[in-house]
């Protein structure tokens, strides 16, 4: 692209009928200094052969704001200089020829207050299908404080949840009921009771258990809450079960949520696939009814896993904090699901910090002030077991729910023993950490010492102690070498 093609055309020539380059229409400005009130998006773009990266960046800015493929005179009926998004920086992606990071600034006036649906319609609504790009990925966003303040965020937050549970200074423990499909309501409730009695704080529904022929949702709720109440009475601890209210319509979701509330549940769950409007709607219901909202990120891997195209999960986490969820599955790094340890830590930081600093090794490109929005409790779930407790505590600290589904239900001595093994492993590791021991390196030794007086933990370590999922992550930082969790 020649120099003129990168320069904005001014005056009458700008609005003559015809086709101009996006940069010529004003969607590229290398001298632009973003305002504090601008929303900034960072895209990873792979232009088609022969497409200049600056023109590709300008096209992203144009197609995600006000542009179309040709000049339209009706631009002059608007404050078009203000409304145009502006690509202002393009950097080659380190070590990846043909890919570029492009920074695009959007004036805040382009977005409806408090609406993730509107935000996503602009930022990801059109550009990902644009022919001049082989691929595009939304890597990160900076959300201005003025925009953050239009959202209400999590209905409960970490602090209030811990106060309700009376649990402080250590991770919470949970498990997903297995098998996730096929159990009758009564047997399902039995699994819930055994897990809670054995020492877990929560049990949960999985993403695809809704209301199938083998178990109506109402039956599941009744048996699960019976299990919760019985386990609470027996142990003297506050217990809970994440009742999945995901359904085909909002009306049905509200109906299930109301029934869960009537039964005394303190928490309900929805899947990410219900959509942004449904998430914000049920979040508002939870706020009005003093309920914790658990978010299962079902389906996210279809657009977050590939490094060259889609949306980074750190962006999804930011949107979900705005939308208002209390719990969010955010990866384990050491389990069976995709997750580079530093990258996953970046997701956790998005959930738990009041201000994110720039942290390129963890994938955070911008400072992000959360304007006192409540914190989200990250959830580590998927292929984890008691033998990894030292890794999990070292990676994620205290404010996390550690969910051992198969690592509880699959215990050779039974479900209650599986829960007890996880509880003892956690308590032993927290104690060792608080005594100043190096749990990252001494973890296996600490666990074996605890197992000498806990047969369930000994059995768990014997059967799963050497199980790991050390595959090369696909979504890693571009600024540091990838590491493994081992």
From Swiss-Prot:
PROSITE patterns assigned to the protein according to its UniProt record, in alphabetical order? RUBISCO_LARGE (PS00157)
Enzyme Commission (EC) number: 4.1.1.39
As to how many cofactors bind and how, the note says:
Binds 1 Mg(2+) ion per subunit.
Q: Where does Mg(2+) bind?
A: 204, 206-207
What are the catalytic residues? 178 (proton acceptor), 296 (proton acceptor)
Enzyme class (EC, first level)? lyase
* Domain of life from the UniProt record: Bacteria
Which residues are recorded as modified (N6-carboxylysine)? 204
Q: What family does this belong to?
A: Belongs to the RuBisCO large chain family. Type I subfamily.
Function, please? RuBisCO catalyzes two reactions: the carboxylation of D-ribulose 1,5-bisphosphate, the primary event in carbon dioxide fixation, as well as the oxidative fragmentation of the pentose substrate. Both reactions occur simultaneously and in competition at the same active site.
Assembly, per entry: Heterohexadecamer of 8 large chains and 8 small chains.
Q: What is this protein called?
A: Ribulose bisphosphate carboxylase large chain
